[in-house]
């Protein structure tokens, strides 16, 4: 996944504070809740006709109703996102925060899209490949997409490896069109 510079700065700032305060998992959960609130109420939260302090209070009221406890630092973080019109980046902030946690532990997130569920043996082969390439232990996020026909698409460290039948067919079609054009 690509992250905006804005999202990565906010995520990294919160991560550094969370690590210092020993609240990384707490802030991770709070970010996910904030993301859910944003996804459900984005029209209201992005409405610039509503004062920022009212939008902040709206989020805090929802968290209070859900009996979600947060500290002053996270309250200020919410305020900062809304006042600076950055709440729209919350999903990227969450992803980068999660990525930073894994990276700090010496792990690497790997997105795998497969035509069918991976067997343990296939997962082990992919694990060894990624580990050899990055010198870090992979953490897989596997998605099944039967439109791939067969094979896998592996995404990690900004690279994409497509070894699917669908991908090969698209390459063949592209090559034929390029020759004819």
Curated annotation (Swiss-Prot):
Family: Belongs to the ATPase delta chain family.
Subunit structure: F-type ATPases have 2 components, F(1) - the catalytic core - and F(0) - the membrane proton channel. F(1) has five subunits: alpha(3), beta(3), gamma(1), delta(1), epsilon(1). F(0) has three main subunits: a(1), b(2) and c(10-14). The alpha and beta chains form an alternating ring which encloses part of the gamma chain. F(1) is attached to F(0) by a central stalk formed by the gamma and epsilon chains, while a peripheral stalk is formed by the delta and b chains.
InterPro entries named among the record's database cross-references: ATP_synth_OSCP/delta_N_sf, ATPase_OSCP/dsu
Functional summary from the UniProt entry: F(1)F(0) ATP synthase produces ATP from ADP in the presence of a proton or sodium gradient. F-type ATPases consist of two structural domains, F(1) containing the extramembraneous catalytic core and F(0) containing the membrane proton channel, linked together by a central stalk and a peripheral stalk. During catalysis, ATP synthesis in the catalytic domain of F(1) is coupled via a rotary mechanism of the central stalk subunits to proton translocation. This protein is part of the stalk that links CF(0) to CF(1). It either transmits conformational changes from CF(0) to CF(1) or is implicated in proton conduction.
Matching Pfam families: OSCP
Protein topology in the membrane: Peripheral membrane protein
Taxonomic lineage: Bacteria, Thermotogati, Thermotogota, Thermotogae, Thermotogales
Protein known as: ATP synthase subunit delta
Compartmental location: Cell inner membrane
Domain of life of the native organism: Bacteria
GO CC term (a single one): proton-transporting ATP synthase complex
Annotated NCBIfam families: ATP_synt_delta, PRK13441.1
SUPFAM superfamilies: N-terminal domain of the delta subunit of the F1F0-ATP synthase
Organism of derivation: Fervidobacterium nodosum (strain ATCC 35602 / DSM 5306 / Rt17-B1)
Keyword line: ATP synthesis, Cell inner membrane, Cell membrane, CF(1), Hydrogen ion transport, Ion transport, Membrane, Transport
Gene3D superfamilies, A to Z: N-terminal domain of the delta subunit of the F1F0-ATP synthase (1.10.520.20)
A molecular function GO annotation: proton-transporting ATP synthase activity, rotational mechanism
Signal peptide, first to last residue: none
């Amino acid at each position: 996944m690509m992250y905006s510079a804005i999202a990565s700065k906010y995520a990294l700032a919160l991560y550094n504070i969370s690590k210092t305060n020993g609240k990384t998992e707490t802030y991770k959960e709070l970010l996910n809740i904030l993301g859910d609130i944003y996804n459900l109420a984005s029209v209201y939260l992005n409405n610039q006709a509503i004062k920022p302090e009212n939008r902040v209070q709206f989020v805090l009221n929802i968290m209070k109703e859900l009996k979600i406890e947060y500290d002053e630092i996270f309250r200020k973080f919410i305020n900062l996102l809304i006042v600076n019109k950055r709440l729209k980046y919350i999903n990227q902030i969450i992803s980068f925060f999660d990525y930073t946690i894994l990276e700090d532990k010496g792990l690497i997130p790997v997105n795998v899209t497969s035509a069918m569920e991976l067997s343990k043996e296939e997962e082990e082969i992919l694990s060894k490949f990624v580990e050899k390439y990055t010198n870090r232990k992979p953490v897989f996020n596997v998605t099944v997409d039967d439109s791939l026909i067969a094979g896998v698409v592996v995404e990690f460290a900004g690279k994409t490896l497509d070894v699917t039948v669908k991908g090969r067919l698209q390459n063949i079609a592209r090559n034929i069109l390029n020759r004819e054009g």
